Amino acid sequence: MITIRDVARQAGVSVATVSRVLNNSALVSPDTRDAVMQAVTLLGYRPNANAQALATQVSDTIGVVVMDVSDAFFGALVKAVDLVAQQHQKYVLIGNSYHEAEKERHAIEVLIRQRCNALIVHSKALTDRELSDFMDQIPGMVLINRIVPGYAHRCVCLDNVSGARMATRMLLNNGHQRIGYLASSHRIEDDAMRREGWLHALQEQGIAASESWIGTGTPDMQGGESAMVELLGRNLQLTAVFAYNDNMAAGALTALKDNGIAIPLHLSVIGFDDIPIARYTDPQLTTVRYPIASMAKIATELALQGAAGTLDITATHCFMPTLVRRHSVAWRQNAVLITN
């Protein structure tokens, strides 16, 4: 598929210049316009009609693409976007993608057709190339929890590796060495980075984690429960587990209680995200806070600035997670044989 970037390369101009030509901007010289249109004809490029429509209209809607708005984490993201939208007298339209490339692509395209010239996109399935093509066409498109090279000023991210290392170090500092990881079955960057942080923290202490220390499930309570049961069935004598997210950690607590294992007396559990459920589990969940509301607010402001052409292209927006100490982690007791 021929993209706007291919046209820019053929004409020897920037993507922004091609966009101005295609949108009939007066800020382009006749020679440049001719060069661009010759490249368009030569390559057979077909401009995105949706993007062209957005370039000539002011929109009162902001689009958001998330994995699943019914998930508490993504619900918090959307709520934060809506708070900023209301301050700017705008409305929010939402697309669910379920971490599937085709659904992510379709959600973005639908929101563009709905005249959303500011988009906040949580994308895990589309390639960097496809996302950058969308971002070239839509100046108000911002990514959250994803960095695409060359577009860092339009990306809002979290240091997942540091967050996972922080969680694992807390367990290590409480005397734990045999620390399991409850991994997400969704093959996305977040899980890979959290697994990396867990491994690095263990390696720093000379601990070689076995693949058998990893239980895998869907990133929800049911998945956490099944992943914990998987680990229990291996009789690994783990004394602590770090979960991919709080939902999985909550599911793990259920599995442990069902097997008569006291938390944190016999086994410590730490989560990631600090969604509301973390305060209401029994015991309350020690976790790593993902500042998703703050990140979503920044992303929305950036999207509006991008749509208005006022973005600072030198800025970067990477957040650090913080540790939230509650009651699911304690000093390691003598390891007990865990049976299913």
Swiss-Prot record:
The molecular function terms of the Gene Ontology recorded here are: DNA-binding transcription factor activity; transcription cis-regulatory region binding
Which GO terms of type biological process are on file? regulation of DNA-templated transcription
Boundaries of each HTH lacI-type domain copy? 1-56
Look up keyword Oxidoreductase and say if it applies: no
Q: Which residues bind DNA?
A: 4-23
Task: Report the PROSITE patterns cross-referenced here.
Answer: HTH_LACI_1, HTH_LACI_2
Q: Which UniProt keywords apply?
A: DNA-binding, Repressor, Transcription, Transcription regulation
Per UniProt, subunit arrangement is: Homodimer.
The UniProt function text for this chain reads:
Repressor of the mgl operon. Binds galactose and D-fucose as inducers. GalS binds to an operator DNA sequence within its own coding sequence.
Q: Which NCBIfam families match?
A: PRK10401.1
Please state what the protein is called: HTH-type transcriptional regulator GalS
Natural source organism: Salmonella typhimurium (strain LT2 / SGSC1412 / ATCC 700720)
